[in-house]
A protein has these predicted regions:
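Hinge/lid segment of periplasmic solute-binding proteins
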Residues: 9-61, 76-77, 212-219
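Extracytoplasmic/periplasmic substrate-recognition and gating elements
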Residues: 205-278
Length: 370
């Protein structure tokens, strides 16, 4: 059978493909592209070969109260801070509530959300799973879930129809943090956590901290620091029937024109585009891009907010931050689903921490041994 010439490897580990010689070495094509050093080296093997490259990337962000954001340096300290505020969660008045995180009520979505930015720590150098790190992930996620558990039980009792199990939200990585930032103005959550993929996403994050100066944002580091989110990891099949055409297409994706096709789905990996003005240009600093409203939980008043173009200084700070990110998150659905499935059973109290970690190890090692 003939497979496709160009492979989109999102959610799939390319290691096996590369080891079996199924992927073309892209280093020749990409040498000309002038990629950002930090992204390129993350995918360059010891012998200089490159079997896959993301077309764009995202930056993990955390936003919330300034002191709290500064206190979060990894997953355990995130759990510490959320636990510290335990007494504030729940119904603060008849129709106003506060939770640790937006996904706090839904074990599956919460774990998937947290997995995103911790998963890079789960693999050992030798390509096997690190049980200690998996255990730490499950343990800290459980603390985060427990921090909001009483509040959720209170909400469920007050609004049973809102918590119908069939209505579970589905976590979408590409959803970006921008939609979550408004809950900070209304004080419904302790933190907004997620990723930014565009100048507009960054405008949301930055504007919230300008509207409410008690808020701040920072790179969100989990069990592993300085991670980025790869978007559309591309490879060329070594059995490609139209190899020249496939190479031309990949060259185009990593050209200035190809990188500028869309500005919504990730930051450019080509240095000249990333460093340039065009990609980031949203008009004059301070111009209003979007307006929105959310009801303020403290006094019930409607809050109207404007998302404005960030200053050049703020954009430059973000650009510098993007160049410091060295490790892609583990983009492997088989591993993350094993962790999240067993994690849900642990969060729900059906199995112990050790049982959950063992189940993950067994499931994943079977898969890795294939």
């Amino acid at each position: 059978g003939k497979g496709p010439d160009i492979l989109i490897l999102d959610g799939i580990s390319s290691e096996t493909y590369a080891e079996q010689g199924m992927l073309e070495d892209l280093s020749g094509i990409l040498k000309e592209a002038g990629l950002l050093d930090n992204i390129e080296s993350a995918y360059t093997k010891e012998d200089g070969s490159i079997y896959e490259m993301p077309v764009k990337f995202g930056i993990p962000m955390i936003e919330g109260n300034k002191e709290d954001v500064q206190a979060v340096t990894d997953l355990a300290s995130l759990a510490d801070v959320l636990t510290k505020h335990k007494d504030e969660y729940g119904l603060t008045s008849e129709n106003i509530y506060k939770l640790p995180l937006l996904y706090s009520m839904y074990p599956q979505a919460l774990l998937e959300k947290l997995a995103d930015n911790n998963s890079a720590a789960w693999m050992k150098e030798n390509g096997t799973l690190d049980e200690k790190k998996i255990k730490e992930f499950l343990e800290q996620s459980e603390r985060i879930y427990q921090a909001g558990k009483d509040a959720m039980d209170e909400l469920k009792a007050a609004y049973p129809q809102a918590f119908d199990d069939s209505e579970q939200p589905v976590y979408e990585r590409a959803g970006s943090i921008s939609g979550e930032t408004a809950v900070l103005l209304s004080r419904n959550c302790e933190f907004a956590l997620g990723d930014i993929f565009s100048p507009l996403d960054f405008a949301f994050v930055n504007s919230m901290a300008e509207i409410d100066t008690s808020l701040a944002y920072a790179l969100w580091n989990g069990q592993m620091a300085n991670c980025f989110i790869p978007v559309s990891r591309i490879g060329i099949s070594s059995r490609a029937s139209q190899k020249a055409a496939a190479e031309k297409f990949v060259e185009y994706l990593f050209s200035e024109e190809g990188q500028m096709l869309s500005r919504e789905d990730g930051f450019p990996v080509v240095e000249s585009v990333y460093n340039g003005e065009d990609y980031w240009n949203q008009g004059e600093a301070g111009n209003v891009l979007v307006t929105g409203g959310s009801s303020n939980s403290e006094n019930g008043q409607e809050l109207v907010y404007s998302i404005k173009v960030p200053s050049a200084d703020k954009v430059n700070e973000l650009k510098q931050l993007g160049k410091m990110l060295t490790t892609p998150v583990l983009d492997n659905t088989i591993i993350t689903s094993a962790v999240c499935e067993n994690g849900v059973r642990y969060l729900n109290g059906d199995i112990s921490l050790d049982e959950a970690a063992n189940a993950v190890m067994q499931q994943v090692n079977l898969y890795l041994a294939e």
